[in-house]
Amino acid sequence: MTGAGNGLGAAFAEALAAKGSAVVVNNRRHADRPFTPDEVVRRIADAGGTAMTDGNAVDAPGAAERIVASAIDRWGRLDVLVLNAGISGPAVKVGAGDTQLEQVLAINLTANHRLVEAALPHLRRSPAGRIVFVSSTGGLHGVRGRSAYAASKGALNAYALSLAAELRRDAIGVNVLAPYAATKMTAQPGQEPDPLLAPEGAAETCAWLASVECDRSGEIWVAGAGHVRAARALESATMRFSPDALSALAAMPEPRGYQGGEAAFADFYQDITGE
């Protein structure tokens, strides 16, 4: 469980531990503040669960291999990868250069890819390999003032859905969780967090997606306050191009969802050829 020192990650770690998982509680160390995973592990232990800490920053060189090794060295196996670590980053303005965008992508996308690569050999040996990518509806709809963050989460969604298709034969379940929660990352200055959106309200969905009982894969789930909804990309019916056609299709008549870009193209081709 990456990014599990507080907020959503801590709630997810505790929920999985309550279901019987032994959890690696990962979070980067900060020299100027306490190492919060220690407290998360203590709460898990007090509740009768099993957990250990890991202080690797997910974007550091070799971190993926070290994080995975923490689980293997301690328990000899790895069944679940929950990729929660991420940053919102500053607002990226046109003309500001690439540095801020690259930083957000390095943590929100590239680090997750590296962890998947490091974990896959072990997940393939597991009787119930599961990967849960923690994303955001910003990756589906965009976020005004946070274009880099939205781009990173949109890329993460596409990566996860593609990976789900690639790993279907390995029986590894891959899903995306887009939680709504009031955390330090989402809080506005001087604003009290909404108790309805406590991180625990999305934790049950995370624990289910990570469980052996979950037989779903290749899907995006939005969760918060103990509720859940499905999300997916949709395309409308097909019409010959004209400005009027764009106006008509913007209302999304006959919306269609697809399992992969290949299926979307095949359906489009059938519409234009009648075959």
What is each of the regions a protein language model found here?
Residues F35, A57, G86-E102, G145-A148:
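Conserved mid-core segment of classical short-chain dehydrogenase/reductases
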Residues V176, D194-E275:
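C-terminal helical subdomain
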Residues V116, S152:
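Active-site helix of classical SDR
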Residues S21-P37:
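Conserved glycine-rich Rossmann-like NAD(P)H-binding loop of the short-chain dehydrogenase/reductase
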Residues R66-D73, V92-G95, T99-A106:
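Active-site Tyr-X3-Lys motif and surrounding loop/helix of classical short-chain dehydrogenase/reductase
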Residues M1-V24:
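Canonical Rossmann dinucleotide-binding motif of NAD(H)/NADP(H)-dependent dehydrogenases/reductases
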Residues S136:
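Residue(s) in the substrate-gating loop at a strand-loop-helix junction
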Residues D79, I87, G97-H113, V132, ...:
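Catalytic Tyr-X3-Lys loop
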